[in-house]
Swiss-Prot record:
Belongs to the PdxS/SNZ family. The active site is at K94 (schiff-base intermediate with d-ribose 5-phosphate). It comes from Deinococcus radiodurans (strain ATCC 13939 / DSM 20539 / JCM 16871 / CCUG 27074 / LMG 4051 / NBRC 15346 / NCIMB 9279 / VKM B-1422 / R1). The gene is pdxS. In the presence of PdxT, forms a dodecamer of heterodimers. This is Pyridoxal 5'-phosphate synthase subunit PdxS. The keyword Lyase applies. GO terms for biological process: amino acid metabolic process; pyridoxal phosphate biosynthetic process; pyridoxine biosynthetic process. Residues 1-20 are annotated as: Disordered. Gene3D superfamilies: Aldolase class I. It comes from the Bacteria. The keyword Hydrolase does not apply. Its EC number is 4.3.3.6.
Length: 307
């Protein structure tokens, strides 16, 4: 329940993977939690001790990917295995958009979730991975409802806002969350006979548009990501109506990662309690410096990757 400490989520077994129902059910277990980017086993242990629901194993956090430039690819499987061995909570890892072989490799080494991520350099500018062909569940980013439903149609078990990863600036995550939730309200307001036209305009599967019309939500879990850097940022995304939060560079690029990780977990749990939010926001040390979105040239905007 929201406002209550959540039970610790464990790694999946082989028997728990495979069908869309099992994959989406596993994703539901992350609701109300925080998923943290980590680049070492020690960071993964810090995240687990802080109460993270899962960790995202990668060689460079998004802020470093931005700074270093070049082609960003799937992380070394050896590094991912080391992180998997260090913690008992689920471990996620990223693949490039459209790179089916990277996804096959991650499934083979036993990761619990794959992020088909715009943070990495896209491998295919026309097609995303057909995620339903995999036993392991996928999470994908989206800027609007049409994009979210296309990813679900391909088999994604979780959606997240794209935001602008590595900036420490939550404004784009807020924009994308409001866009998706606003589009959902707009679909709900349309009469049933107009839904085929809505599906055409959204470029989304008709049956998924029908689901949104009937239920007023996405068919899968909807998380915030991209620029979350403070407990207040995390609570803001929860108050907007999202199901949980990914935090990338915001923790381990800050002055006190342990305290900030704990504070963000508490903020997500108690996102409607200003007294607790004030308490957990105190004395955290300096956050990551951050980047103003207006300073990014179009080519540096990661959210524009994918379609």
């Amino acid at each position: 329940m929201r406002g209550q400490p959540r039970p610790k989520l464990r790694r999946m077994t082989e028997q728990q993977t495979g069908t869309p129902q099992l994959k989406q059910g596993f994703a539901e277990m992350f609701k109300g939690g925080v998923i943290m980017d980590v680049v070492t086993a020690d960071q993964a242990r810090i995240a687990e001790a802080a109460g993270a629901t899962a960790v995202m194993a990668l060689e460079r956090v998004p802020a470093d990917i931005r700074k270093d430039g070049g082609v960003a690819r799937m992380s070394d499987p050896k590094m991912i295995r080391e992180i998997m061995a260090a913690v008992s909570i689920p471990v996620m890892a990223k693949v490039r958009i459209g790179h089916v072989v990277e996804a096959q490799i991650l499934q083979a080494i036993g990761v619990d979730f794959i992020d088909e991520s715009e943070v990495l350099t896209p491998a295919d500018e026309q097609f995303h991975i057909l995620k339903r062909d995999f036993k392991v569940p996928f999470v994908c980013g989206a800027k609007n409802l049409g994009e979210a439903l296309r990813r679900v149609g391909e088999g994604a078990s979780m959606i997240r806002t794209k935001g602008e990863a590595g900036t420490g600036n939550v404004v784009e995550a807020v924009r994308h969350a409001r866009a998706v939730l606003g589009d959902i309200r707009a679909v709900q307001s349309r009469p049933a006979e107009e839904l085929m036209t809505v599906a055409r305009d959204l470029q989304a599967p008709y049956d998924l548009v029908q689901y949104v019309h009937a239920h007023g939500q996405l068919p899968v879990v909807n998380f915030a990501a991209g620029g979350v850097a403070t407990p207040a940022d995390a609570a803001l995304m929860m108050q907007l109506g999202l199901d949980g939060v990914f935090v990338g560079s915001g923790i381990f690029k800050s002055a006190n990662p342990e305290r900030r990780a704990q504070a963000i977990v508490r903020a997500v749990t108690h996102f409607q309690n200003p007294d607790i939010l004030a308490e957990v926001s105190e004395d955290l040390g300096a956050p990551m410096t951050g980047i103003n979105i207006d300073e990014l040239i179009p080519e540096a905007r990661l959210a524009s990757r994918g379609w």
